[in-house]
């Protein structure tokens, strides 16, 4: 339990006596193959580079419980090169995704339910991180489609998708931080949300069959005329 006057520190979940990264790091280094170490972030958001490096290449999973139904999962063998100290803070809802124009979001979401999400860190992680976010139990069984906003193209790009579990939770894979939109749908959406919205449009039938038919008919007439000429010539000879 946090005492008055103490600085806020993360701690190993279910063992609040082990708090602070200087204590947590040795626990990660000593973890056995297949172990999962869950850290309650306790209001903090930044994880030092040396802590992430402590599980690099190992069969160890670090879970960061951010609170409010949000948690990060980092698998040691997925770490290629930690970029540095990383701020894993996540903003969801109305205060998130402010760099994404409303018309860009609407063009992809249409009538679908959606939620904006912003990561505090800017740039590549140097590893794959899986975020668990709650999309409400009413959406259980549906798919949460993650779209990244590309500021250069000013478009939303499909990143990944996950099926929402009975409790409303879904796991989504991230490799870098930015502004995102999560779109709930009955299926996994394509990498072009705009194209998906046009699925019901009628596509004009090709005119190939019509032109081919005319070509075939013209050939038939030529053959018939040729046969008639041959019969006339043969009749004249005999």
PLM regions and their residue ranges:
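Juxtamembrane cytosolic interface motif at the C-terminal end of transmembrane helices
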Residues: 234-238
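Proteolytic processing hotspots in large secreted/extracellular or virion-associated proteins
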Residues: 9-151
